[in-house]
């Protein structure tokens, strides 16, 4: 399994993850954000590129690897492979960061839902956001109001090209 998808794996050619989207996530009143997209790997790769270029703290959780920094591949959170341990770490961590989760549907059950509700309602976790990325993000009953939803539709049409030093479609 590829732990850190690269931006070269992009099939859409579209840049979705921009500093404006990052700011929208950081400034969101909700601590839980869902990005609904059919291109989850591309979105994760673009978050990685943003983290590398800007130095922002963006982390990615995978079941087989736990929480890992997208900015520095070698930085991992020990003991975070289980979803509940990762959520506890996020709840207790004093560090700012955006935590990305994909393929999380099977983990949306107790005790994880309790931890997610705690994170969503807590004001002490300000600056730490959990972002679910994928096309099948169905939150348990009553949790939809705790999540800010962002939709990403891949643009169909001409691929961008460079003209006079600017990208145009």
Task: Provide a role label for each language-model segment.
Residues 2-169:
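ATP/nucleotide-binding catalytic cores
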């Amino acid at each position: 399994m590829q732990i850190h998808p690269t931006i070269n794996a992009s099939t859409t050619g579209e840049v979705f993850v921009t500093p404006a989207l990052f700011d929208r996530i950081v400034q969101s009143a909700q601590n839980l954000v869902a990005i609904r997209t059919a291109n989850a790997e591309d979105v994760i790769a673009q978050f990685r590129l943003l983290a590398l270029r800007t130095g922002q703290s963006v982390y990615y959780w995978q079941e087989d690897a736990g929480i890992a920094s997208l900015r520095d591949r070698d930085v991992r959170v020990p003991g975070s492979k289980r979803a509940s341990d990762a959520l506890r770490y996020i709840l207790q961590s004093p560090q700012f960061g955006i935590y990305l989760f994909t393929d999380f549907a099977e983990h949306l059950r107790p005790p994880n839902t309790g931890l997610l509700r705690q994170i969503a309602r807590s004001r002490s976790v300000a600056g730490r956001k959990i972002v679910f990325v994928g096309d099948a993000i169905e939150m348990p009953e009553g949790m939809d109001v705790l999540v800010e939803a962002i939709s990403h539709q891949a643009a169909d049409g001409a691929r961008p090209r460079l003209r006079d030093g600017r990208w145009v479609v």
